[in-house]
């Protein structure tokens, strides 16, 4: 009679699969990562992997959280500062862009891929497997960070700007502004992907400045 795996044994298997996937993300294109290859690298049969994860795409998204480390650390530092809602908003987006343009394929798949509406569950599962990698954020930043999808994440930090001096946001146009911001971010991310494919150099600082300028144009009145 087979013994049921202990929570520690189960977590160890989960870690093996996630680490194997993370290493493959660093080495291969996303379209070359398959369940069988992940299972082989982790030292298990592919049927074992299916008993723990929905599919390869979910596992790739889960393993991608590791590449949010610098962004998450920046948010932890930001949490210790007493910034206004508006300054907080711009700083969060600046940190986000700097990291996204550094890892465009990972961020594009994570926020616009198959499981881009499962982000809360993905973050929670990842940090339950790797608790030492989780940084402490303020309650407001944490709520944004683990938001269900990019639309909710952005809206969560955009809404507090409604009615503030110097911006054009109100209850009627905030959803439109949110959609414009996300669409522009996605377009820039796609641009970076094309540059990478053509082996062109990408200036992440310049692209981030470009995004931030457009962000202010969408929100501010002057």
Where are the predicted features?
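Basic, helix-initiating cap at the start of DNA-binding domains
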Residues: 1-28, 32-41
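Short, hydrophobic secondary-structure boundary micro-motifs
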Residues: 34, 108-111, 170, 197
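Short hydrophobic/aromatic patch on the recognition helix
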Residues: 42-53
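Amphipathic alpha-helical packing segments from all-alpha helical-bundle domains
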Residues: 116-164
């Amino acid at each position: 009679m087979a013994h049921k795996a202990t929570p520690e044994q189960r977590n160890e298997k989960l870690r093996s699969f996630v680490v194997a996937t993370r290493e493959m993300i660093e080495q291969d294109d996303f379209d070359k990562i398959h369940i069988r290859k992940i299972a082989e690298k982790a030292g298990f049969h592919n049927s074992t992997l299916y008993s723990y994860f929905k599919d390869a795409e979910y596992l790739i998204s889960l393993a991608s959280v590791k590449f949010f480390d610098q962004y998450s650390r920046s948010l932890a530092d930001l949490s210790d500062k007493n910034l206004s809602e508006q300054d907080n908003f711009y700083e969060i987006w600046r940190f986000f862009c700097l990291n996204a343009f550094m890892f465009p394929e990972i961020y594009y798949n994570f926020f616009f891929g198959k499981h881009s509406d499962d982000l809360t569950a993905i973050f929670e599962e990842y940090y339950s497997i790797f608790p030492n990698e989780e940084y402490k954020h303020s309650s407001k930043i944490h709520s944004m960070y683990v938001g269900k999808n990019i639309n909710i994440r952005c809206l969560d930090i955009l809404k507090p700007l409604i009615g503030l001096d110097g911006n054009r946001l109100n209850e009627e146009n905030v959803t439109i502004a949110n959609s414009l911001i996300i669409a522009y971010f996605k377009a820039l991310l796609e641009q970076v992907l094309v540059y990478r494919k053509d082996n062109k150099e990408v200036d992440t600082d310049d692209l981030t400045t470009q995004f931030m300028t457009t962000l202010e144009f969408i929100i501010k009145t002057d």
